[in-house]
C-alpha cells in the first residue's frame, strides 16, 4: 500500500485538492492522509466542510499579523514532526502558496518524494505575483512528479530542465471541483437581489495590488456603476483589513454594490455561475470562470495563465483605472465582444484531472 499525504493550507488550495483527496480514497492501493496548515483558517474550514473532509493533522499556524517569515518558519517546524510520524512515500502539494513551498522544502530535507499539483505555471517575474512566483519555481526544483494543468505549463517545465518522463498534463483540478459544487437549482438571497440586473462578481485581494492599484481598480468599478443602472456588483471581500478599508472608502456608499463576507466554496462557485462577467485579481478564478462561460477581466499586470488569454476567455487589464473602465465598458456595450469571450474554448480541462492523477500514481513505483 502506498502512503500518500496531501498537504494544503489555504482556501484556493483546498478547493483544488479536496476532489483529489476524495478520488484517492476510492482506491485500496493508497493509504491516504490529509494535513492542513491552517494558513487560512475560517475560509479553509468552509471548504473542508463543503467537501466533507476531516483532516488527519492540523498544524493551526494561523495568527493575526503574521509575516511571511512567521508562516514559513511555523510550517517548517510543525510539518517536520508530522512527516517524521507518518513517513509517507509521497507528499502531494498544490500550486504556489507558502504552505506548498515550506512543505516541499521540509520533504526535501527529509528526502521524501514530492508531487506538485498545478505545476509549471510561470510569469518569470519574481515579484509578480509575490511571493507565489518564487514559491512555485522553488517547488518545481524539488518535485519528483509534476502534474501540469496545460501543455504550456508542461513546456515551461521542460525548458527548466525537468524530466519529461515525470511531467503529466492532466487539466486543472479546479474544474473537477466545479462539477461537484455548481447546482442548477441553487438559491441565495443575494442572487435574488441581483436577478433583474447584470451581475458582476468582483474579487480583489492580491498582496501586490494593495494600496494605489487597489484604489484604482475600485474607482473604475464605481465609475461603471454610476453610468450603468442595470449593473450590480457583489464583492465577497477578503479578511485583510487593508483591502476592507480601501473597499469601504471607494465602494462603500453605493446601493448597487454589495460588499459581503467571504462565501463558502459552494456559494462562491454558484455566484460565479449566475454572474454576467467577473473582475478579479485571483488566480483560480481565471480557470474556473471559462468552464462556466463567463468573461474575465484580470486586474493584474501579469498572469501565469496565458492559456486563458490565448483562448480568449481572459483579458489582462492591469490596475490602471482608465484601462479597466474601457474594457469593462466594452463588454457591457458590445454583445459581439461579450459573446466572443463567453463562448471561447476552456483550456483547463474537462473535470477529470483527479482521475488522471490517480491513474498515474497507481502505475508509479512511489
Annotate each language-model stretch with its function.
Residues 1-235, 240-366:
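Nucleotide-activated sugar donor-binding and catalytic core shared by glycosyltransferases
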Amino acid at each position: 500500500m502506498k502512503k500518500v499525504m496531501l498537504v494544503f493550507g489555504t482556501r484556493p488550495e483546498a478547493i483544488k485538492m479536496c476532489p483529489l483527496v476524495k478520488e484517492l480514497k476510492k482506491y485500496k492501493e493508497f493509504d491516504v492522509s490529509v494535513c492542513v496548515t491552517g494558513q487560512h483558517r475560517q475560509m479553509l474550514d468552509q471548504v473542508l466542510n463543503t467537501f466533507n473532509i476531516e483532516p488527519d493533522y492540523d498544524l493551526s499556524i494561523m495568527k493575526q499579523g503574521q509575516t511571511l517569515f512567521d508562516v514559513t518558519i511555523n510550517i517548517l517546524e510543525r510539518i517536520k514532526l508530522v512527516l517524521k510520524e507518518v513517513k509517507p512515500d509521497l507528499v502531494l502539494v498544490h500550486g504556489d502558496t507558502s504552505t506548498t513551498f515550506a512543505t516541499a522544502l521540509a520533504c526535501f530535507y527529509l528526502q521524501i518524494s514530492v508531487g506538485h499539483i498545478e505545476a509549471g505555471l510561470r510569469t518569470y517575474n519574481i515579484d509578480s505575483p509575490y511571493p507565489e512566483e518564487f514559491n512555485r519555481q522553488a517547488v518545481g526544483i524539488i518535485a519528483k512528479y509534476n502534474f501540469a494543468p496545460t501543455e504550456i505549463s508542461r513546456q515551461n517545465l521542460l525548458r527548466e530542465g525537468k524530466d519529461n518522463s515525470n511531467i503529466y498534463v492532466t487539466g486543472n483540478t479546479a474544474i473537477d471541483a466545479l462539477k461537484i459544487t455548481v447546482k442548477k437549482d441553487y438559491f441565495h438571497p443575494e442572487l435574488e437581489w441581483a436577478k433583474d440586473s447584470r451581475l458582476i462578481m468582483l474579487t480583489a485581494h492580491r498582496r501586490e495590488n494593495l494600496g494605489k492599484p487597489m484604489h484604482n481598480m475600485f474607482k473604475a468599478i464605481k465609475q461603471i456603476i454610476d453610468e450603468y443602472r442595470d449593473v450590480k456588483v457583489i464583492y465577497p471581500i477578503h479578511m485583510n483589513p487593508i483591502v476592507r478599508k480601501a473597499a469601504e472608502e471607494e465602494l462603500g456608499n453605493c446601493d448597487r454594490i454589495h460588499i459581503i463576507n467571504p462565501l463558502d466554496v459552494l456559494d462562491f462557485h454558484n455566484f460565479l455561475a449566475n454572474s454576467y462577467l467577473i473582475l478579479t485579481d485571483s488566480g483560480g478564478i481565471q480557470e474556473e470562470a471559462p468552464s462556466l462561460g463567463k468573461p474575465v477581466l484580470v486586474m493584474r499586470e501579469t498572469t501565469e495563465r496565458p492559456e486563458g488569454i490565448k483562448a480568449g476567455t481572459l483579458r489582462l487589464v492591469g490596475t490602471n483605472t482608465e484601462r479597466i473602465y474601457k474594457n469593462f465598458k466594452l463588454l457591457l456595450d458590445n454583445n459581439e465582444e461579450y459573446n466572443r469571450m463567453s463562448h471561447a474554448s476552456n483550456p483547463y480541462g474537462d473535470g477529470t484531472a483527479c482521475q488522471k492523477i490517480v491513474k498515474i500514481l497507481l502505475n508509479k513505483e512511489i
